[in-house]
Amino acid sequence: MEGDGVPWGSEPESGPGPGGGGVIRELCRGFGRYRRYLGRLRQNLRDTQKFFRDLRGSQPRGCPSSPAEGGEAGRGPAGDVAATGLPAGQLSCISFPPKEEKRLQQMVDCLPCILILGQDCSVKCQLLNLLLGVQVLPTNKLGGENCKLRRLRFTYGTQTRVSLALPDRYELVHTLAAHQGTWETVPEEDLEAREDSEDAARVLAELEVTMRHALLQEVDIVVAPCQGLRPTVDVLSDLVNDFLPVITYALHKDELSERDEQELQEIRKYFSFPIFFFKVPKLGSEIIDSSTERMESERSPLHRQLTDLGYLSSSLCNCGAPGQDTKAQSMLVEQSEKLRHLNTFSHQVLQTRLVDAAKALNLVHCRCLDIFINQAFDMQRDLQITPKRLEYTRKKENELYESLMNIANRKQEEMKDMIVETLNTMKEELLDDAANMEFKDVIVPENGEPVGTREIKCCIRQIQELIISRLNQAVANKLISSVDYLRESFVGTLERCLQSLEKSQDVSVHITSNYLKQILNAAYHVEVTFHSGSSVTRMLWEQIKQIIQRITWVSPPAITLEWKRKVAQEAIESLSASKLAKSICSQFRTRLNSSHEAFAASLRQLEAGHSGRLEKTEDLWLKVRKDHAPRLARLSLESRSLQDVLLHRKPKLGQELGRGQYGVVYLCDSWGGHFPCALKSVVPPDEKHWNDLALEFHYMRSLPKHERLVDLHGSVIDYSYGGGSSIAVLLIMERLHRDLYTGLKAGLALETRLQIALDVVEGIRFLHSQGLVHRDVKLKNVLLDKQNRAKITDLGFCKPEAMMSGSIVGTPIHMAPELFTGKYDNSVDVYAFGILFWYICSGSVKLPEAFERCASKDHLWNNVRRGARPERLPVFDEECWQLMEACWDGDPSQRPLLGIVQPMLQGIMDRLCKSHSERPNRGLDDST
């Protein structure tokens, strides 16, 4: 229902009041800015959620997205590797934690609103009128003990409209006084909630006033109801779930009442929102010039009370205003003409929310991006190390097999001699033991009378077992001593290597390891085998049984001491030591051959399984490098850039300092507390360049600060670049004096140049220690400060080794030959340093002759691949020349490590710069 009230315009007329058009315009600008950035943040969150949905969708069915969902399922290695390349145990780390997602969703869904609290209803209405710049609410009749002001909400609409609505925004169909006729301010009877009303819903309903006003187009305004009608804490509780409240508290007295203090204490107890305290001028009073007000250094009673309540800090100024870029804090304004401070306060409240949301979102991006990069390293290592492990396992098992076969062949004669020696030394002892032997399960008459054939056989068998057990122990000890040596030498490493290979297969079946154990069982478990009645024992038993069977008698003998010695004597004399040793070694070889063949077959099966797994791993590695990581890096760049622009605003471009292949470098006087700065403006032409830039930014921001690397201060995405025709990424970094190219042209002393070389090596070593490869080390990417100390810049081609795709990048004359094959590592930086060192030692920027003769890049690349290198100049020191040659060696494995290069350089510098002075033409310090 529409009322016939005053059709308030979209722009209030500027009047003498403190809430003039200037304040309203600033508020509109601030809330409009918040909505724009909130829209970008909301879009980034939507893209992030879509990224994680796509990531979950790419996982194979049955693979849990988190431990809570999957439990113990999918623990087998074949089933716990998702299409992301990540084991199931780590999938929870690359998911969007539900609590964080819910919190961020709530943060971006909450639109701002201005909430007006106050000492009484009259002063709240007065502040509302000041904010809108027009008289909307009556102020002279409200307030007092009997006031029952309901909650009021002011929203934007093309027509003026007044209605009642429940808290869930359902509109009540009630006839209001505002509907009855013409009015200038909202009728009082519509503002008050009458408790004697028969309709309970009408008492709880809020009055919604829709009007065409510039400020309401950006933000809703809510006037809190009377404390007696509903506590302020309850009002705030309703609001915070759907809105971000910018809380104002209207004052008209010089001090807070006890009820006011209690209300503020309750708010502080349950909420952490800052509050803008504003002392509203008395009705009809003139605005007093601030020069006649209390001196800033004096603290008013209100200020002291609010300080005691914890809202204000004694370290802030009298108005309680914090600095421009600090976290939002409560503020007290007692001069009515300073309502403009509400702009600063609201800016800080809104900015704090945006920065917190952007920071939380960026943390999710960075955490998951780091996991992807670490997983890329793990996958790359897996691809490199698994074939080597398989080859090592095959080689070592073969060595073990051959060693054990040699033992079997070599030990046969030793066993024969050992058996003869053992029998000779133990013969009397064995005969005595046999004579004194107490038979088991055989009843021998005390008078020595003959017993039956069955008992005789049992007695003979027990005597045989006694002799064999003693002999077996000696043979076992001989074999065990040999195999234990093998076990100590390399079997342990072989077992560990097998375990790591079998980890990625079915954990319940380690067939290959079992066959390895069988190979060893043939020897070092011989003691257990002999004592448990192995085939060797049975073979010995059969051999001795044949000997014993040749002993004949006419009638069963008497079981006497002499008979037992005779049986043992004949058994010992009838044993053939050579045949026994040959049989033992033959059976040992048979076992070895059987286990070796089974091991080889199972290893081939294991290798086939790994071959399929590695093929999938390589696909996953490519997906992480080409899709997952770049996509997430772009989201991270957007969220971090949003955070930077909120905190430090967009930087101002100064004069152009230089141009590169992908961007322009400008001077930037100051940004984010850094002075002076350089600003690199990059306009990515396509998705690939966007992704490369985003990853570059992540690597640079992730690096710890280092004195040999140029600092990156931050980034801002400029959506209005080129008049809005394109989007540019502005990278704000440390500004230095000049680059090495300019320095060499101007002239640098030898000691200075060698120190620069040391600085460059230190910087590259640091990058390598972080797993990064620069890939574009050259004169113009080495910057010098005013003391001519060097820092490496332009990490545009810098990537972790595991994230490199083999693309050909860099500057032609500094590019190592293997770069053209697409297979390279961090030694390409050593090559590039060798070329850079040639320039440093030459002291000029003149191209080497071998490169100067090349008519094109292709010609240059072909010459480099054929071995073309810079020539030796007469001024070169022998050790310097040898170092250059070593660095640009065509074989990457022959290039020295930078940990070796650095002390060599230091030695060269100490020798050349301390032993003799510079030549006149080479010792010119740069005077600029």
From Swiss-Prot:
GO terms for cellular component: anchoring junction; apical plasma membrane; basolateral plasma membrane; cytoplasm. The active site is at 776 (proton acceptor). Residues 394-430 form a coiled coil. ATP binds at residues 657-665, 680. GO terms for molecular function: ATP binding; protein serine kinase activity; protein serine/threonine kinase activity; protein serine/threonine/tyrosine kinase activity; protein tyrosine kinase activity. The lineage of its organism: Eukaryota, Metazoa, Chordata, Craniata, Vertebrata. It is found in: Cytoplasm; Cell membrane; Apical cell membrane; Basolateral cell membrane. GO terms for biological process: cellular response to fibroblast growth factor stimulus; negative regulation of apoptotic process; positive regulation of ERK1 and ERK2 cascade; positive regulation of fibroblast growth factor receptor signaling pathway; positive regulation of kinase activity. Residues 651-905 form the Protein kinase domain. It catalyses: L-seryl-[protein] + ATP = O-phospho-L-seryl-[protein] + ADP + H(+); L-threonyl-[protein] + ATP = O-phospho-L-threonyl-[protein] + ADP + H(+); L-tyrosyl-[protein] + ATP = O-phospho-L-tyrosyl-[protein] + ADP + H(+). Pfam families: Pkinase. Keywords: ATP-binding, Cell junction, Cell membrane, Coiled coil, Cytoplasm, Kinase, Membrane, Nucleotide-binding, Serine/threonine-protein kinase, Transferase, Tyrosine-protein kinase. Residues 1-22, 55-81 are annotated as: Disordered. InterPro entries: Dual_SerThr-Tyr_Kinase (IPR051302), Kinase-like_dom_sf (IPR011009), Prot_kinase_dom (IPR000719), Protein_kinase_ATP_BS (IPR017441), Ser/Thr_kinase_AS (IPR008271). This is Dual serine/threonine and tyrosine protein kinase. Its main location: cytoplasm. Its EC number is 2.7.12.1. It comes from Bos taurus (Bovine). Acts as a positive regulator of ERK phosphorylation downstream of fibroblast growth factor-receptor activation. Involved in the regulation of both caspase-dependent apoptosis and caspase-independent cell death. In the skin, it plays a predominant role in suppressing caspase-dependent apoptosis in response to UV stress in a range of dermal cell types. It is an enzyme of class 2 (transferase). Belongs to the protein kinase superfamily. Ser/Thr protein kinase family. It comes from the Eukaryota. Residues 1-14 have a biased composition (Low complexity).
